[in-house]
């Protein structure tokens, strides 16, 4: 029984790596997503771009409003806004694209064989496009002063900011792995869990690093505003943290496989099922 299940699991993982799976409506299995495949992939990319756009627009926008209008939002309000917009976009587009919204999350899913590598550059491009468009929108809407910069820069030491980014990004991916890729989890609550994680992370690390957790979230405003101070922190930190979070959850996931098999395959349990695929997100 166990051997047969393992064979099915490996076959499902192999199909994901080759870009094969259910079509857009969860029907016939064909290459990539078909009917036709290009249309389906385009829908995913549009969903990723729109989701990332509104996450950056809302999260960064509330920062600008808070500075320009005398602190009317307050720091707790900023934290809640980030958590809510991520949750809303997961439930809005997760069933279409998987709701990554984060290049580090996309790369991590690919590393652990949860996402086809050939779609990674396209997803990352869509995410950066969404962030750039949102940043341009905010610059056009508001007179953004240097004090109202809506990107991310270390409040003190770059080293402290880097450590903070690694830790909170680790937590983010650990939660995503638990609620969105483990069949034992309640998939319908994934959006709430991820949104609350974002909110808590902003509360804790916001005053230290700005709580990015997402290279696209930081690079978009940096490019639009021309502020690149310690931008490397917001690329290295989230990537290291997210990959580490996914790897650790994979190690502690219950399985009857020996540890050497887990570290060899580095796979996330089973292939993503339609009921869980829409919840695999982040900021």
UniProtKB/Swiss-Prot annotation:
The record ties this protein, via Pfam families, to: MIP
UniProt key word Transmembrane helix: yes
Q: Which residues cross the membrane?
A: 45-65, 70-90, 122-142, 161-181, 189-209, 231-251
Q: List every position bearing N-acetylmethionine.
A: 1
UniProt-recorded Gene Ontology molecular function terms: channel activity
Residues modified to Phosphoserine: 267
Segments carrying motif NPA 2: 214-216
**Membrane topology category:** Multi-pass membrane protein
User: Motif NPA 1 residues?
Assistant: 102-104
GO CC terms of this entry:
membrane
Record's keyword terms, sorted? Acetylation, Membrane, Phosphoprotein, Repeat, Transmembrane, Transmembrane helix, Transport
In terms of PROSITE patterns, this protein maps to: MIP (PS00221)
Family, as annotated: Belongs to the MIP/aquaporin (TC 1.A.8) family. NIP (TC 1.A.8.12) subfamily.
The cross-references to NCBIfam families, in alphabetical order and at most eight, read: MIP (TIGR00861)
Record-given protein name: Putative aquaporin NIP4-1
Q: Which gene encodes it?
A: NIP4-1
């Amino acid at each position: 029984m166990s051997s047969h299940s393992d064979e099915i699991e490996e076959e499902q993982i192999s199909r994901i790596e080759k870009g094969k799976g259910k079509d857009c409506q969860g029907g016939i299995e064909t290459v990539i997503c078909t009917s036709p495949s290009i249309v389906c992939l385009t829908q995913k990319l549009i969903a990723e771009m729109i989701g990332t756009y509104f996450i950056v627009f809302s999260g960064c926008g509330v920062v600008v409003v808070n500075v320009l209008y005398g602190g009317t939002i307050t720091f707790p309000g900023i934290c809640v806004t980030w958590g809510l917009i991520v949750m809303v976009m997961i439930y809005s587009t997760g069933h279409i694209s998987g709701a990554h919204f984060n290049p580090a999350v996309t790369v991590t899913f690919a590393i652990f064989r949860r996402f086809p590598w050939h779609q990674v550059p396209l997803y990352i491009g869509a995410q950066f496009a969404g962030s750039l468009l949102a940043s341009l929108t905010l610059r056009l809407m508001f007179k953004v002063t240097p004090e109202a910069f809506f990107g991310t820069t270390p409040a003190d030491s770059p080293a402290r900011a880097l450590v903070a980014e690694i830790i909170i990004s680790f937590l983010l991916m650990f939660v995503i792995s638990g609620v969105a890729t483990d069949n034992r989890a309640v998939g319908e609550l994934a959006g709430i869990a991820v949104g609350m994680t974002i909110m808590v992370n902003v509360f804790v690390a916001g005053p230290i690093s700005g709580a990015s957790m997402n290279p696209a979230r930081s690079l978009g405003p940096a490019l639009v505003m021309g502020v690149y101070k310690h931008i490397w922190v917001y690329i290295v930190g989230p990537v290291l943290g997210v990959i580490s979070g996914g790897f650790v959850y994979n190690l502690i996931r219950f399985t009857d496989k020996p540890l050497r098999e887990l570290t060899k395959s580095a796979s996330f349990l089973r292939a993503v099922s339609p009921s869980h695929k829409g919840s695999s997100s982040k900021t």
